[in-house]
């Protein structure tokens, strides 16, 4: 499954406001909701979102398959960048490395029409991510390839958030068993992050 960005504001009293714009928990529209958070000790410091937040907890709620989206609501604190703009965490259940990045207020991006826009609100941030995704992964580009060591992979699915990597030159049967899938998330700086390392 693809990665989903959230915007969060933590206050000192334990309240967190979370915003999202995705098909899973917000119906494809921008929404905000407040709940609470805490830091607990569990073999390390853990950030826990300890009251239900519809926008965020939908990803960690089990569905009829017993798994749902496989998301987390508790995160082991792993460290901080030297400039203190990024906090590195790991999902306690999933083991996926994630980042909490300082909100990029004032950052510029190019919208779908090619105009330069500025991130002035949380809603603008989601518009910027959508514009970057549309610009990076559109039907004008015939295909993508990735080289890793001495192997080349055809890359597909970037526009829908799940990257499929298939080694070049395989038969259809071989490709079915050797295609690797990784969820991705598009960043404001036109980079993408994989949900797990590709080796």
Which residues does each predicted region cover?
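Lipid interaction determinants
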Residues: 1-32, 40-199
């Amino acid at each position: 499954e693809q990665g989903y960005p959230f915007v969060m504001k933590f206050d000192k009293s334990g309240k967190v406001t979370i915003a999202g714009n995705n098909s899973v928990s917000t119906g494809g529209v921008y929404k905000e909701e407040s709940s609470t958070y805490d830091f607990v000790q569990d073999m390390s410091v853990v950030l826990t979102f300890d009251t239900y937040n519809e926008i965020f907890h939908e990803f960690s709620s089990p569905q009829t398959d017993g798994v749902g989206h496989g998301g987390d609501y508790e995160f082991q604190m792993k460290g901080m960048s030297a400039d203190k703009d990024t906090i590195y965490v790991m999902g306690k259940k999933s083991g996926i490395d994630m980042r909490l990045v300082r909100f990029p207020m004032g950052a510029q991006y190019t919208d779908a029409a090619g105009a330069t826009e500025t991130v002035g609100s949380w809603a603008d941030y989601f518009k910027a991510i959508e514009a970057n995704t549309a610009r990076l992964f559109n039907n004008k580009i015939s295909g993508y390839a990735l080289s890793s060591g001495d192997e080349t992979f055809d890359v597909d699915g970037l526009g829908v958030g799940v990257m499929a990597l298939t080694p070049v030159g395989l038969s259809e049967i071989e490709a079915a068993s050797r295609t690797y899938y990784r969820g991705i998330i598009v960043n404001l700086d036109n980079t993408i992050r994989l949900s797990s390392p590709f080796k």
